Amino acid sequence: MPELTFLPATDEDVSAIYDLCKDLVNRYEDPASMDIDRVLLWILDKIQSNIAKYTCVREAGEKVAYYCLAESNDGWELDDLYVLAQHRNRGIGSEILERCISEASASIFLYVFTGNAGAIRLYERHGFSCVQQVSKTRQIMRRDG
């Protein structure tokens, strides 16, 4: 695998990150339990307001992934880790997680859709475990630092 390059995301990346997030919401969220349109507006605002905290991952100049690692009151939160579909199962997610683990000076937590078995397996391989089921469709996973 060619070397990955980690660069700050820019305003140009907002729509790509939003589209990846929207795809997961449409795939895993229960539309009967919430106003999906309102949730998607909140997500877009969150991404736009925090784009400076996001990282764009490139391989040989091509965008292959995005993530946001930010300090919070409860440790570090890993948010919106997305590896583009055509680049999955090649170790990119693992390399990003290893980088985040080494950058974080405390525990790391994240929210994951309960139905996203591939992501859950990836996180478990890197020492994360479920600490709370927050809804029928989402859980919090944590890795202590």
Say what each PLM segment does:
Residues 83, 89-102, 121-125:
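Conserved acetyl-CoA-binding loop-helix of GNAT-fold acetyltransferases
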